[in-house]
Structures are given as C-alpha cells and as structure tokens.
Amino acid sequence: MFQKVEGIVIRTTDYGETNKIVTIFSRELGKVSAMARGSKKPKSRLASVSQLMTHGHFLIQMGSGLGTLQQGEIISTMKEIREDIFLTAYASFIVELTDKATEDKKHNPYLFEMLYQTLHYMCEGVDPEVLSLIYQTKMLPVLGMRPYFDTCAICHQETDFVAFSVREGGFLCSRHAEQDPYRIPVGEAVHKLLRLFFHFDLHRLGNVSVKDSTKKQMRLVLNTYYDEYCGIYLKSRRFLEQLDKFQI
C-alpha cells in the first residue's frame, strides 16, 4: 500500500554505504520511518528530500515493518536554519524531542502543526531559544505531564510565586516555598511566561523579547523537571549547552 503524507524529517540514520532510514513526523500518520534507498548518493532523487528538517510531501510504500520512501517533493528545505549553527542546534533539539517523545504511527495533527510552526518562526528570525522554551513547555502534556503552572503546587491558590519545586511538581507561593529545600528560586516573569507558553495558541505568537536571565531560569526549571519525570536523554541538549558557552 502506498501512502502520501505531508511531513518533516526529524531523524536520519545511515544504513549501509548508500541508504538512509528517514523518520518523518507527518500530518496524516504521526511518526513514520522509511528506507530511502540510494539517498546517500549525490545524484539520487531522494538525496535532498531526505535531509534533516526538510518539509515536504512523501510517498511511502507501507508494509508490516519498515516502509520504503519512493519519492518526495520539497515544500521547504528550512535553509535559514541549515545556514546558521545556532539555529541548527535549537532546531535539532526540537526535532529530537519530538522523536523521543512520540510513538510510531500515532496520529497527532496538533503536534505536527506545532512542529511546523516552530521551525517556520525560526526561519523568520524569531528568537530560537524562546521558541525552544515554548516547544519544550508545550510538549509536557504530550508526555503526560502537567505541572502546576497556574496555582501553588501545595495550597492551590493563585498567589505570589517565588520558586519552582520539582518535588511538588510546580510553582510555590511565598508561604510554602520553604517546604522544599531544593526549590528553584524564580522571578515573576518566569511564572508568567511558562504559564503563558503552556496555554497560548502558538499561531498567535507576536514579537517576543525575553531577558537572558529569565530564559536561563526557565531553561533550568524545564530541564530539571524533564530530568526528574521524563527520562529522555537528548544529545542535542548537550550540544546546545556547549554552544551556549561560546555564544556572545
């Protein structure tokens, strides 16, 4: 059976001297993998369409196991991302998180649209670190996690938030922050932005400017929470951390 899908390449794996296995997150099927035979040859008709982060239409011969990529038509190569090492690093984090957080052939058009929109914004020049924070926040419910972003994790009141508790699973107000000695102190902007990112429609993203100190706190909160509850190891996250040391 042949299936035509719109999708984005989120992972490629070399297979032999000339082949690649491409993993595509598609609008129609969710995550699907297929053998792209001969795609490592420069003159192959599958060479360009099987590149990481390529957005296109793909014709896949489906089977009980691994499918075969028959042909593809590029919609966007995301060249703005490919030409910038920092954009590539953040985009790699986003597609790897998508890959690690999803199962094969689980239809999720909402997630496809979120992935596409995030990479599209990145190509348009929106702050890639902010986009990665938004994406990481919005992936929480996909992974079955819902931290207390709206109320204090202990008293469940909407009040002044001064810290984030991984142990309690959310923000803590000033009255209960002392109950977790390992709490992460945060500024008011961190709470407001994480709550906003969790709930808002990504299509409505306008001009966004976030202080570096706020982004750093948000990253600490999210990474620590993911490490405790998710158990996903991302090579791209380590690469990002190394790149950040050299970014001016």
Swiss-Prot record:
Keyword DNA damage on entry: yes
Gene that this sequence comes from:
recO
Q: Which NCBIfam families match?
A: reco (TIGR00613)
An example Gene Ontology biological process = DNA recombination
Instruction: Give a short account of what the protein does.
Output: Involved in DNA repair and RecF pathway recombination.
As given in the record, the signal peptide range reads none
Does the keyword Chloroplast belong to this entry? no
Q: Which InterPro entries match?
A: ARFGAP/RecO (IPR037278), DNA_rep/recomb_RecO_N (IPR022572), NA-bd_OB-fold (IPR012340), RecO (IPR003717), RecO_C (IPR042242)
Name assigned to this protein? DNA repair protein RecO
| Coiled-coil region | none
Gene3D superfamilies assigned to the protein according to its UniProt record, in alphabetical order: Nucleic acid-binding proteins, Recombination protein O, C-terminal domain
Taxonomic lineage is: Bacteria, Bacillati, Bacillota, Bacilli, Bacillales
